[in-house]
Amino acid sequence: IFSGALSDHLGRRKGLLLLGYGLAALTKPLFPLAHSVEAVFVARFVDRIGKGIRGAPRDALVADVAPPAIRGACFGLRQSMDTIGAFLGPLLAILLMLWLDDLQSVLWVAVLPALLVVLLLLRLKEPTRPTETRPFRSPIEWRAWRRFSRSYWWVVAVGGLFTLARFSEAFLILRAQQLGLASQWVPLVMVVMSLCYTLSAYPAGWLSDHLRRSHVLAMGLLLLIAADLLLAVASSIPLMLCGAALWGVHMGFSQGVLATLIADSSPSELKGTAFGLFNLVGGICMLLASVVSGALWQGWGAAFTFYAGAGFALLALLLLSRRPRQASWQQSQSGCD
């Protein structure tokens, strides 16, 4: 929350983005230099802090610069690029390991992309907001929450319930192993999921600019329900991989659209705070979802876990249908939702 609110208070996002991505760049050399588990833990911890700092200001900056008519496509593109990086990074690491056969050398190579990001940010020119439009004198102002409409809190609630239905992708790997997928082929599950996510995120964002965003999000929920049901009944690896593919497509139809809805339903001077609150709720719900899913897996098995996920997705779909009357997330050019 704090980094997003601070970016609203300062009227600029770039400094916090540099801090967040800079921390990530600083931690990268620590991994090849680490000689203990404690050192790796510290490096990873600082890296996660950097991710937390940059998350809300980054999404708020996208909302600041994206033209309203193509805001969904812009967030979809951001999701696609983020997933491409998460997909190509491990793939490149595997290829380098096969070529160099030296883990430390591969870890040093990872320093380069992190530094390039910082250099690109240094050249970034962001729009400035006049001081008089900044909402409060202090970045920590609970009064700011009163500025958020029912529409915004409704999107946060839908997103939280959605996240409860979308537990960690680690359960997809567990399901594949349960069905007999050999350990050397386990990464294939994440490859299929990430590839489908990457390919669907931008088209889904574009679609949300031309249809009601809530309808596109409903498609994402229906895809999640279908993925859960398929993963619950799958008795073979091909069926399981089809479920993973549907899971990836549902991510493409939901994550960017949810971010766009947050941008649509929050005041322009509180975008950072809005994304910070949304990310906080999402993080808490993801933790709860993984804990509950782990307990269900241990107590009732894999199928019941995925059925429960489908149930939560159905609840989110019902909440989605109960949108506040004043909610209008479609651009002025294309009407209201």
Regions of interest found by a model, annotated:
Residues 110-113, 121-135, 321-332:
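Helix-loop junctions on the cytosolic side of multi-pass membrane transporters
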Residues 88-107, 288-302:
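Transmembrane alpha-helix termini and helix-breaking/packing motifs in multi-pass membrane transporters
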Residues 1-12, 97, 200-212, 297:
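Helix-to-loop junctions at the C-terminal end of transmembrane segments
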Residues 105-122, 304-321:
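Symmetry-related core transmembrane helices of the 12-TM Major Facilitator Superfamily/SLC fold
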Residues 30-44, 232-243:
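Helix-loop junctions at membrane interfaces in 12-TM secondary transporters
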Residues 126-158:
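Juxtamembrane intracellular "pre-TM" segments in multi-pass secondary transporters
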Residues 43-84:
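Cytoplasmic helix-loop-helix junction between adjacent transmembrane helices
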Residues 15-29, 111, 215-230, 307-310:
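Structural signature of the two symmetry-related core transmembrane helices
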